[in-house]
Amino acid sequence: MMTIISLLLLASLLPHLTFTAHVNVGIVNGREAKPHSRPYMVSIQWNGTHICSGFLISDEAVLTAAHCWNRNQTLTVVVGAHDLRESKNSDHIGVKCYIQHPSYNVHFHFNDIMLLKLQEKVKINNYVKWIPLPKNEEDVDANTLCSVAGWGQLKTEGPMSDRLMEANVHIMNRSECHERWGRTFSEKQMMCTYGHGGSCRFDSGGPLVCNDTAIGVTAFGDNLHCNSPEKPNVYIKISPYIPWIKRTFRNVK
């Protein structure tokens, strides 16, 4: 009975997780990541189900997408995981504070970034580490080789992956991305990628990684086709938010 109730509750919240025509974006046309090669990756879960990715930026802080949290939810962060079916090397940690960007706009995707302060500090080891962030206003050139990872769907309307998947992507020219997405796209806040592989549903909140630095947060893509060449995946640029991230964690107890 409880399983049925949980599934019904999850179904009722899915519209919030895919809040517009451009849904939140597992990895398509990718490969299984080498176990624990991305120790900063976390699975964000609700009632034991993976709903988003995130990444450690300190021993007590996770960065993810703002749309990954509905205010009625109590989320759990799983660190140190590769296969979500296995508990070895992983740890489940509660969230103490949910801090969506104050200017987050659910309808237009703007400022779709959120900090999670954990209830306890993670234990740093070979399976759990944080990833560096860019400097203020630091940008990445078009065509730069980067990568994405997650436990989301393996194809459009397909199953989610139990094991962490990854794919290489390239940074798209900003003007081209703006042309594809129109007013939905903000050149100041966002960036796009292109490539054979890419993000899909339930990869939201994971990092776009370039040169071992997290430079973006997976935000949205085409709801009809994962990793669509016509509507490329969009990421929130982290560099403009560095002052907010630092200021927020100075003020959070």
Feature locations, PLM:
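Conserved catalytic-core segment of clan PA serine endopeptidases
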Residues: 28-29, 78-123, 136, 182
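Protease-domain processing segments flanking chymotrypsin-fold serine proteases, especially trypsin-like
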Residues: 1-63, 75-81, 86
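Short edge-strand/loop segments of extracellular domains
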Residues: 76-86, 132-138, 168-174
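Extracytoplasmic
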Residues: 37-39, 72-74, 90-93, 111-113, ...
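Extracellular/luminal ectodomains of metazoan preproproteins built from arrays
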Residues: 3-36, 122-130, 137-144, 176-179, ...
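Extracellular/periplasmic catalytic domains that process cell-envelope and extracellular macromolecules
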Residues: 33-37, 56, 69-70, 87, ...
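Extracellular trypsin-like serine protease catalytic domains
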Residues: 41, 45, 144-253
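Active-site substrate-binding loop(s) of clan PA
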Residues: 99-105, 121-164
